[in-house]
Regions:
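Active-site cofactor/substrate anionic-group-binding motifs, chiefly glycine-
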Residues: 42-94, 98
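Selective transmembrane-helix segments that form parts of the transport pathway or gating/packing helices
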Residues: 42, 46, 50, 90, ...
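Membrane-interfacial helix-loop-helix connectors in multipass membrane proteins
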Residues: 63-87, 154-196, 200, 204-223, ...
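Final/C-terminal transmembrane alpha-helix of multipass membrane proteins
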Residues: 220, 226-244
Length: 249
């Protein structure tokens, strides 16, 4: 019974994706909605992303240094490990999980509140495709999400450099040499491919849970929690699949 319910929800989700791109809202209206979503979802997230990235990058460098107890192991591996950790996993994946809480709860609660207050019903009565009106601007706004992850990568490595050098764990030259050593450009491509997929999940899964929720204010809170859980699970699952497909061979 539970399996049938889950499969039904997945089917409903894909039908929602199809409906989002039907009957487009006028560009003059859509343009304002897109800029509002960029402000709410991208600009407002930069502060927390920068803060977390900087300090986690520092922690990665310090923990790597503390585990290099053998004097024969070169110190430039601190920079190498920090770069690999930040670019491959921390910036694209774990920042996205954090954003599932920050962006996801905002999206679910805002759309859920509109459902509770019957604003979505009013849009439908006026002949507006409410899914296109509410969700499409979020998808377009989150096309800028790779820009946020790029900043996260830079600050993570910069935080690692500061912690490693000024913590006395390595020299600046060693860290930079390690950060440049055996660099594979495809790793950046891989990270941004993941980021684009995660951006789509961040825009649509919370929207789905907000749009189809039933009940009152209490249910809005519950829907936000469920949306966060399922967005996080989807991100981790797709992270595994994409890693296997893109790096497994």
């Amino acid at each position: 019974m539970m399996l049938i319910r889950y499969l039904s929800q997945i089917g409903r989700y894909f039908l929602m994706l199809k409906e989002i791109f039907n009957k487009q809202t006028k560009w003059s209206v859509m343009k304002k909605l897109i800029f509002k979503e960029i402000d709410d979802l991208i600009i407002d997230s930069l502060g927390i992303v920068c803060f977390i990235s900087f300090f986690v990058g520092g922690v990665v460098a310090i923990q790597t240094a503390l585990n290099l107890t053998n004097p024969l192991i070169p110190k430039y591996l601190i920079g190498f490990a920090t770069r690999q950790s930040v670019i491959l996993e921390f910036a694209p994946t774990f920042i996205s999980v954090i954003m599932a809480g920050k962006m996801g709860s905002f999206i679910t609660s805002s759309i859920g509140t509109m459902r509770v207050t019957e604003q979505i019903d009013a849009l439908e009565v006026m002949g507006v495709n409410s899914l296109n009106y509410l969700v499409f601007p979020k998808i377009i706004a989150l096309l800028l999400y790779p820009f946020v992850i790029g900043i996260s990568m830079f600050l993570g490595i910069f935080g690692g450099w500061l912690a490693g050098v000024y913590g006395g764990f390595t020299t600046s030259d060693d860290f930079i040499m390690g950060a440049q050593m055996e660099f594979i450009p495809f790793h950046i491509t891989y990270a941004f491919i993941k980021t684009i997929i995660f951006a789509m999940l961040l825009a649509t899964i919370p929207s789905f849970h907000g749009y189809y929720m039933k009940g009152g204010a209490l249910e809005v809170g519950k829907a936000s929690t469920v949306a966060f859980v399922w967005t996080s699970v989807s991100i981790i699952l797709f992270n595994y699949i994409l890693t296997q497909l893109l790096l497994g061979s």
